[in-house]
């Protein structure tokens, strides 16, 4: 699966994750996501309310990634935001 990073994701990643202990974990979990986006360990789920139409998966206990799938073939995921539960929801 192809992954793209939105400008808002890149900004949030630099601010909230880069140069922390979570950065290496993020890249490992992203590999898992690319192989199977619905792996049980990721806890991938649809969002509701103001984030309806988006999905989320868990990187660590309190680190989430918000994303959506494009209708392209092959499937492509666009990562929109990353942060704690309170930061992204």
Task: List each language-model region with its residue ranges.
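Enriched for short, Lys/Arg-rich terminal
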Residues: 2, 8-14, 58-89
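Short, charge- and proline-biased low-complexity linear segments
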Residues: 23-32, 77, 82
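A short, hydrophobic secondary-structure junction motif
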Residues: 30, 36, 86-89
